[in-house]
From Swiss-Prot:
Substrate binds at residues 69, 114-118, 182, 187, 256-257. This is Dihydroorotate dehydrogenase (quinone). Catalyzes the conversion of dihydroorotate to orotate with quinone as electron acceptor. One of its GO terms (biological process) is 'de novo' pyrimidine nucleobase biosynthetic process.
Length: 350
């Protein structure tokens, strides 16, 4: 367990603007990781290994992309007990994202709305940070699995999006345990159009070709996952599942944030533009996971994410068909203690 209960820090952090609180937390984490001060949030890692997509995960709870967009805090995040950590989304060039304010808390619903828009420092800075991480340089029996999440720049026309994804894939490939192709953020104009039949087929076809070339060049085949939205009907999920299999993708991350506001109507900030995350997304995400599992069959890796606020929520994703889960908004509301709570619940209830 953490030596400093998150309950002591949360009132201070929740007294700040959400993005200011996030920046302060990440800056503190970056400065203290690997030092004695990190004992304030360190935790022993639950041992519950699983082999997935050719990788060995130490346990079944990971960090979702979006918290550490620039890969500055890999070591500090690893110390919280995660079995895997996904950082990004990174784009070829740095970009500021959408105008502020762009992040809003809905505490009555244990939820957040964000319209950040892939704000990040760009691929070169991202890769420099990845390479400086201590956990990536340590030779341990159960190393941290690191996922690198890639996207497109806002100024890149959607018809040229594949060029941005290939640029990022070229850069991250030597450094990633797996790569996630993010085509589901609602905060980059037209990005979700890449989930449609023909667009997804074309994109994944190019990515698959480039991966084969990179595998020959680097002497290793890095698994590629695709992150999709919760706002899909059954027919759309079936098309995506078939396209993933056709292009030999290694897994799917389900799901990103939702545009729906049905679960938060009437709450302050509920009508802000952006993606809704947290508790209200749990069932929508689980529905997509169930549909994916039915369409993909047993054995196709699914990372379940969306609305995990407790150990029981994590178990619900495994029962829906996910192999492992990720958390992000739950970490903000519940603190690092949620990592082990979720990992232990999955271990006990599988």
């Amino acid at each position: 367990m953490s030596l400093l209960p998150y309950a002591l820090a949360r009132p201070f952090l929740f007294g700040l603007d959400p993005e200011t609180a996030h920046e302060l937390t990440m800056a503190s984490l970056a400065r203290t990781q690997g030092t004695p001060l990190s004992l304030a949030w360190c935790s022993s890692r639950v041992n519950d290994p699983i082999a997935l997509a050719g990788l060995k995960f130490a346990n079944r709870v990971g960090l979702a992309a979006g918290l550490d967009k620039n890969a500055r805090c890999i070591d500090g995040l690893a110390a919280m007990g995660f079995g895997f950590v996904e950082v990004g989304t990174v784009t070829p060039k740095g970009q500021p994202g959408n105008p502020k304010p762009r992040m809003f808390r809905l505490p009555e619903a244990n939820a957040l709305i964000n319209r950040l828009g892939f704000n990040n420092d760009g691929l070169d800075a991202f890769l420099a940070n990845v390479q400086q991480s201590r956990v990536r340089r340590q030779n341990t029996p159960n190393p941290l699995i690191l996922g690198l999440n890639i996207g497109k720049n806002a100024v890149t026309p959607i018809e040229n999006a594949v060029d941005d994804y290939l640029t990022c894939l070229d850069g991250v490939y030597p450094h990633a345990d797996y790569v996630t192709v993010n085509i589901s953020s609602p905060n980059t104009k037209n990005l979700r159009a890449l989930q449609s039949d023909e667009a997804l087929d074309a994109l994944l076809g190019r990515i698959a070709e480039r991966r084969e070339s990179l595998a020959r060049q680097h002497g290793k085949r890095v698994p590629i996952f695709v992150k999709i939205a919760p706002d899909l009907d059954e027919a759309q999920v079936d098309v995506i599942a078939a396209t993933l299999k056709r292009h030999a993708m290694d897994g799917v991350v389900a799901t990103n944030t939702t545009l729906s506001r049905d679960a938060v109507k009437g709450l302050r900030h509920a009508e802000e533009a952006g993606g809704l995350s947290g508790a209200p997304v749990l069932e929508a995400s689980n529905r997509v996971i169930r549909q994916l599992r039915a369409a993909l069959g047993a054995g196709f890796p699914i990372i379940g994410v969306g609305g995990v606020m407790s150990g029981q929520d994590a178990v619900s994703k495994i029962r829906a068909g996910a192999d492992v889960v990720q958390i992000y908004t739950g970490l903000i509301y519940k603190g690092p203690e949620l990592v082990n709570e979720a990992a232990l619940a999955i271990k006990k209830n599988r």
